[in-house]
Amino acid sequence: MVLDELISEFDRGLRSLTGISRMSRPVPAPAEAPAAELTPAERTHAAGLMRVNHVGEVCAQALYQAQKLTARSSAAKAMFEEAAREEEDHLAWTAHRLKELDSRPSVLNPLWYAGALAIGVAAGTLGDKVSLGFMAETERQVESHLDGHLSDLPAGDTASRAIVEQMRADEAKHGKAATDAGGIELPLPARMLMRAASKIMTRTAYYL
């Protein structure tokens, strides 16, 4: 049973890194078509933002895989699995949008994935309450980050905006579920360290 689980998670990891993500929900569609085509500068900027979001989803897969494998209770395992499935939709959506923008994922995705996997294992070994608290804080920070992207995306990029809005709704749901399941609030130094690491990742992934 453990071997089957490891093989399944290894397969998910490979799909995350190779761009063969499974989509259980269709790509969110904008409510209205853009008034005009994006300029080259707007496309480049939108692609940078969506590349950052794609990296975030690569990291989410690694985090939740590690936390699921190290979780003590079946309830916590199920929660991490459900979140990972929805985050895989996000991974596929952002990859799809990057292709539409004639861009690509981050060349550093293997590095981001490995780092997130190690962090997820570390959080998981501290127990389910800490691990769920880490999940809740991660989702809060991601939700805030997506709010910033909604303000920063070109006004005419309704396609990216529709994706980010659905991602934000899902992240809020995951964070609340983790808190409701008993996740504890992380100490301030841990939260600050997470924010600092996130800034490094987002600034790098925008370009690379």
Swiss-Prot record:
It is an enzyme of class 1 (oxidoreductase). Signal peptide: none annotated. One of its GO terms (cellular component) is plasma membrane. The keyword Cell membrane applies. CDD domains: DMQH. Binds 2 iron ions per subunit. It comes from the Bacteria. GO terms for molecular function: 3-demethoxyubiquinol 3-hydroxylase activity; metal ion binding. Pathway: Cofactor biosynthesis; ubiquinone biosynthesis. Coiled coil: none annotated. It catalyses: a 5-methoxy-2-methyl-3-(all-trans-polyprenyl)benzene-1,4-diol + AH2 + O2 = a 3-demethylubiquinol + A + H2O. Keywords: Cell membrane, Iron, Membrane, Metal-binding, Monooxygenase, Oxidoreductase, Ubiquinone biosynthesis. Fe cation 2 binds at residues 87, 139, 171, 174. Its cofactor is Fe cation. It is found in: Cell membrane. It holds the Pfam family COQ7. It is a peripheral membrane protein. GO terms for biological process: ubiquinone biosynthetic process. The keyword Transmembrane helix does not apply. Gene3D superfamilies: 1.20.1260.10. Fe cation 1 binds at residues 57, 87, 90, 171. Belongs to the COQ7 family. Catalyzes the hydroxylation of 2-nonaprenyl-3-methyl-6-methoxy-1,4-benzoquinol during ubiquinone biosynthesis. This is 3-demethoxyubiquinol 3-hydroxylase.
